[in-house]
């Protein structure tokens, strides 16, 4: 919860935890998601995590898939201490091959004669005892999803085959004595029928994990953690944007420490149309949270001048300026509170960081690369005088929404689309100027207004208009113009780790395009982004 390591009771100390070690698969985060859907708490760490550095003992370990070949030089390998921990282990795809590689001797992993991508028919073999537990209640055959080039060519010592496919004679293996299992398919993807049952068998039946990870339980535990961390007189200043993440975080903090929580919104000049006014009304009237709005738009926009092609620099400038303003406001609030019932030091800064933010900001030395610096995770100055408190840091987006409902937050707030901390600045590709902000802001307002009017808002996970760094020729009012291009983006997703573009019908897009071109001065062309994530990210920068 706190990034300085002072959190007295992290979730893995409270809930039984399945540890997922990531070898770089595009599906790894889904393993954690599926386990949490089963009410089993799970955390993901890099595959090269040293067990000696692990602050908890997991109930079980899952080795993820990955884009590597275990036999190649430089391929990532797990800490050998994993196999001395005495807990059940499940290897998925590359994880199976890594397990076989570890046990060595007669085991072999080789490039398959035929790569296997897509659906496959898995046949389950019965051997009795613990070896049958992984495939309990799935039947003798099931449809699974394969995504591999290499495969196991020889069985490791003391293992036996528990499942096969036409192209993978060792599609499922199990240790004869220990609760070690390997599967070549991906149970975490929805294409695998009964995949969640396989994960349940491992986590709940084999690992004996409790199924008590619920938002109702999380609220009680988190409020206790916050109170213990902050203390009886400690105060927290909250970074509030009006999005679902910061709203839920603010409500949780209010429930935990009452008036010792100070909600502050910084108008950075790159908010949505009328955002500051609407957020203030929403939080104060709807949730009983007093909100201080600081208009720092001139400072932010002045500091963003001249940044044309470096989105990371934009994020860092916004992050540095944001913290600078918050530190000054914290001093003012602390001074005003000295002679009140709230007397105490403001030591903490609340942020609505989520688990996908943490995952995307990790820089693994082995299998993974940094995708981008998230505004709630990176880009913060090293000399900041406030410690971060991030009560949502272990949650996925859908869990945050469920938490919001648990806290009694109105549905229209719970289901509000996310809005990034750097705001419209990362939806303007190129230099951020007041004129560019105006154009992007007005286009975005029209797009969202039309989505709501069409009854599509809840069907779409995130939508916005972005301003591209190019101009196009058009004809308006019988005259040639050379004006801006707006790109519309809308996606569907459950956890924001992967996303598909939303398939609007042509009439809807025609209507939005016509309105933007006619109502937003300076725009002559509108395009629709149909890039999924991956390969793209949801935001433009």
Swiss-Prot record:
One Pfam family linked to the record: NAD_synthase
Catalysed reactions listed for this entry: XMP + L-glutamine + ATP + H2O = GMP + L-glutamate + AMP + diphosphate + 2 H(+)
Swiss-Prot/TrEMBL GO biological process terms: GMP biosynthetic process
EC number(s) reported in the record: 6.3.5.2
Signal peptide: none
Matching NCBIfam families: guaA_Cterm (TIGR00884), guaA_Nterm (TIGR00888), PRK00074.1 (NF000848)
Function summary: Catalyzes the conversion of xanthine monophosphate (XMP) to GMP in the presence of glutamine and ATP through an adenyl-XMP intermediate.
Protein's name in the database: GMP synthase [glutamine-hydrolyzing]
Organism, scientific name: Phaeosphaeria nodorum (strain SN15 / ATCC MYA-4574 / FGSC 10173)
């Amino acid at each position: 919860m706190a990034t300085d390591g002072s959190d007295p009771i992290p979730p893995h100390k409270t809930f039984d935890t399945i540890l997922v070690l990531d070898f770089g698969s595009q599906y790894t985060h889904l393993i954690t998601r599926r386990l949490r859907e089963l009410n089993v708490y799970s955390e993901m760490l890099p595959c090269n995590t040293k067990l000696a550095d692990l602050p908890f003992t997991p109930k079980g370990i899952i080795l993820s898939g990955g884009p590597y070949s275990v036999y190649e030089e430089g391929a990532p390998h797990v800490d050998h201490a994993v196999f001395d921990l005495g807990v059940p282990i499940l290897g998925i795809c590359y994880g199976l091959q890594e397990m076989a590689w570890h046990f060595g001797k007669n085991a072999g992993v080789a490039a398959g004669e035929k790569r296997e991508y897509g659906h496959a028919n898995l046949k389950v073999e019965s051997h009795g005892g613990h070896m049958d537990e992984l495939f309990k209640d799935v039947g003798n055959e099931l449809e699974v999803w394969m995504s591999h080039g290499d495969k196991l060519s020889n069985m490791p010592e003391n293992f036996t085959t528990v499942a096969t496919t036409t192209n993978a004679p060792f599609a499922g293996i199990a240790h004869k004595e220990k609760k070690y299992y390997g599967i070549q398919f991906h149970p975490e993807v929805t294409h695998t029928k009964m995949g969640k049952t396989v994960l349940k068998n491992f986590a709940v039946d084999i690992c004996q994990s409790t199924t008590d990870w619920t938002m109702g339980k999380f609220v009680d535990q988190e409020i206790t953690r916050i109170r213990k961390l902050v203390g009886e007189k400690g105060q927290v200043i909250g970074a509030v944007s009006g999005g679902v993440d910061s709203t839920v975080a603010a409500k949780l903090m209010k429930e935990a420490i009452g008036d010792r929580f100070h909600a502050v919104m910084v108008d950075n000049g790159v908010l949505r149309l009328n955002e500051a006014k609407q957020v203030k009304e929403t939080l104060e009237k709807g949730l009983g949270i007093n909100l201080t709005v600081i208009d720092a738009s001139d400072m932010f926009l002045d500091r963003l001048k001249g940044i044309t092609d470096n989105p990371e620099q934009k994020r860092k400038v916004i992050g540095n300026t944001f913290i600078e303003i918050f530190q000054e406001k914290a001093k003012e609030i602390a001074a005003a509170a000295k002679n009140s019932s709230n007397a105490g030091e403001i030591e903490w800064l609340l942020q609505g960081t989520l688990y996908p933010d943490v995952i995307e900001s990790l820089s693994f030395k082995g299998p993974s690369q940094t995708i981008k610096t998230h505004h709630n995770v990176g880009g913060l100055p090293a000399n900041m005088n406030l410690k971060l408190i991030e009560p949502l840091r272990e949650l996925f987006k859908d869990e945050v929404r469920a938490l919001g409902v648990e806290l009694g937050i109105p549905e229209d707030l719970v289901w509000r689309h996310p809005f990034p901390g750097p705001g419209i600045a990362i939806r303007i590709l190129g230099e951020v100027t007041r004129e560019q902000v105006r154009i992007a802001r007005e286009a975005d307002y029209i797009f969202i207004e039309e989505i709501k009017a069409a009854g599509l808002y809840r069907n779409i996970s995130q939508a916005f208009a972005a301003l591209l760094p190019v101009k196009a020729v058009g004809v308006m009012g019988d005259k040639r113009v050379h004006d801006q291009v707006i790109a519309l983006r809308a996606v569907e997703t459950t956890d924001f780790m992967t996303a598909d573009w939303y398939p609007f019908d042509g009439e809807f897009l025609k209507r939005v395009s016509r309105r933007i071109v006619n109502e937003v001065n300076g725009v002559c062309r509108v395009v629709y982004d149909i890039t999924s994530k991956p390969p793209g990210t949801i935001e433009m920068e």
